[in-house]
Amino acid sequence: NSEHCRHKIFNASWTLDGQAQPRSLFAMIRNTHAKSPQLTLSAYKDNAAVIEGFPARRFRCDPETGTWGAGAVQPSAFAIKVETHNHPTAIAPFPGAATGAGGEIRDEGATGRGGKPKVGLSGFSVSHLRIPTLPQPWEAARPLNPRMASALQIMLDGPLGAAAFNNEFGRPAVTGYFRSFELETPESGLVRGYDKPIMLAGGVGAIDPEQVEKLPVRPGDAVVVLGGPAMLIGLGGGAASSLASGESSEGLDFASVQRDNPEMQRRCQEVIDACFARGADNPIRSAHDVGAGGLSNAIPELLHDSGVGGVIDLAAIPRDDPSLSPMQLWCNESQERYVLGIAAEHLDAFRAICARERCPHAVVGVATVEEHLLVAECPLDESPIPNPQFRGEAAIDIPMDLLFGKAPKMQRDAERGANARWPRLDTGAMDLREAGLRVLSHPSVASKNYLVTIGDRTVGGLVARDQMVGPWQIPLADCGISLDDFSGYTGQ
């Protein structure tokens, strides 16, 4: 029920200077699409938005023959997504940024009935770097939060984590940004900055137009966890990220950071690729990635979106730690996992695909007509799906309305602050050369070469424009461009 998962503030009613506002923050965001919906196939309802693309010859494996090749020219679409992973990056920059990139990749893969991530981006906003051997005149000494990594440590480790996951998964990062900002306000003396950083992960993926819309999970369909085992990591990450800095305990801060495993995510993606390549016979009816809240969020969302309930067998959930309690098993945020609704008639075909790709998976439950969620150690009958009639001692036994019923709408009141009067800039006392050197040496302006060359920018073979331009290959490109296929000239 965190802000991360339920967006209570973004859906709240707002009063500004005593005047009721006509739209919530989310309604303001959605208003752009409402005014200009053309060419958009899906927006604000799935793990990523989908936009109409150009006809393309997608390079993929034929599900019948098992051979790879470029098929006939077919309509295509592309998925786009940007999200942040700020709190984990503030606590542990490398795994925080790595799992941020990984979570965005999973969102593209879990769009519709399966998409394919193609190219990515990474971005960072931090406070002053305060490099010990390179002090800068604009960096004033002040106390920093000891429970968060310093801006310098974030920029040393975070970009490496994001680049490592992208490359090890098999996706290039072709653009991004880096900003360092910190300023003392003239009247209050408060220092504004990014002690809690922004870690931005985004990307573009490909998806077949006929796979854009999820199909409802039907009673009797299997609920499958695809990917790695559960471990006691990332517990409470979605909740911790929704708290103000310093409100959570130090133990929760470190427990809430996930760990990355790009190889496992690649195996999952190969399974998804093989499923959507089957076209109308795609065994995946609906998909969600496992992120904030772990299975406690992903499985109920999968069922709720289809208007069904479910019986979930705790004993069937893969785990690497046999000591996990039901709460830990249900709520941990172990990465590289997807929750899939698999058509019962295609379950054997799905299992065969997973075996071929050596990708772990488990049937952990079944959808039911009754909109009720039962989570327990359910005895299995002869089928690979838990008995939906089981009503033993349960860890969770609640109606779905209790999770997704309309909660009281939050009311937020705010006032516009007075515009600060900044002192007039005295240019007469400036040394032009010194001013120029300061501007050029500021991290937001200086070369980003060290953030670009840490990763392979050509992996996948569909990059038409990366960060490096010109005869001296300087990272000055103002865009990244990917191609739709290996023979055409269209792309994003």
Which role fits each region the language model picked out?
Residues 1-381, 388-492:
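Glycine/proline-enriched, intrinsically flexible loops and inter-domain linkers
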